[in-house]
C-alpha cells in the first residue's frame, strides 16, 4: 500500500538495486523492530538447509542444470536475455552459455547426492547473489546473527539423512520439543 515510496532512495542505497526491492517486507518493518534490541536474529537459510529443494534424488547432471535454471530464470527472463545476447552480437546462444555456466558450477561441488548438491549450490551462489542483499536493510540498523550461516550448522546438515531434512521434519520436531 505504498509504504516503500517514502523509503525507495534509502533502500536502493542499501541493496545497490541488486535485488527486487519494490515489495520488500524488510523495509516495511525495520523501523519498528530495530528499537526492540541491539541484535537481530535471522532464520534466513533455514528453509534451504532444512528442506528438500524438490529435485529428483536420482537426477543426472543435465537434469540438475535444468532444475537450477527453472529456479533462477524468471518468466520472460530467457526471452529478454536471448534478445540482448543477440543484439550485442555475443558468441553462441544465451541458453547454451547459461547451461554450461551452471553445469560448471555444479561440477565444482564435490557432492554426489543431487538434493545435497542443489542445497550446496544455493548456499554458495544463491545466498551471496540474492538472499544476502535483503539482509542489508536489517544490518543498516542493528547487528545481525544468522545461525544457519554458521559452519557448525552446515557441517551438521551434512550428517543428517535426507529423510529428516525433507519437509523440515527435524526443524519442526525441535520446535515441538522446545516450544510446545
Task: Cite the ranges covered by each PLM segment.
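ATP-dependent adenylate-handling active sites, centered on carboxylate activation for C-N bond formation
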Residues: 1-112, 133-178
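The feature marks non-catalytic terminal segments
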Residues: 109-122
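Core structural elements
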Residues: 119-133
Amino acid at each position: 500500500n505504498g509504504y516503500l515510496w517514502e523509503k525507495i532512495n534509502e533502500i536502493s542505497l542499501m541493496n545497490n538495486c541488486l535485488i527486487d526491492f519494490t515489495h520488500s517486507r524488510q523495509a516495511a518493518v525495520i523501523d519498528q523492530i530495530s528499537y526492540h534490541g541491539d541484535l537481530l536474529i535471522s532464520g534466513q537459510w533455514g528453509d534451504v538447509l532444512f528442506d528438500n529443494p524438490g529435485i529428483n534424488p536420482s537426477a543426472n547432471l543435465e537434469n540438475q542444470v535444468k532444475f537450477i535454471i527453472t529456479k533462477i530464470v524468471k518468466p520472460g527472463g530467457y526471452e529478454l536475455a536471448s534478445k540482448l545476447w543477440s543484439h550485442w552480437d555475443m558468441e553462441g546462444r544465451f541458453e547454451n552459455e547459461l547451461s554450461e555456466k551452471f553445469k560448471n558450477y555444479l561440477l565444482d561441488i564435490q557432492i554426489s547426492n543431487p538434493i545435497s548438491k542443489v542445497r550446496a549450490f544455493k548456499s554458495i551462489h544463491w545466498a551471496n547473489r540474492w538472499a544476502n542483499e535483503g539482509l542489508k536493510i536489517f544490518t543498516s540498523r542493528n547487528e545481525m546473527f544468522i545461525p544457519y550461516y554458521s559452519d557448525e550448522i552446515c557441517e551438521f546438515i551434512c550428517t543428517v539423512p535426507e529423510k529428516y531434512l525433507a519437509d523440515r521434519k527435524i526443524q519442526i520436531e525441535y520446535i515441538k520439543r522446545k516450544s510446545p
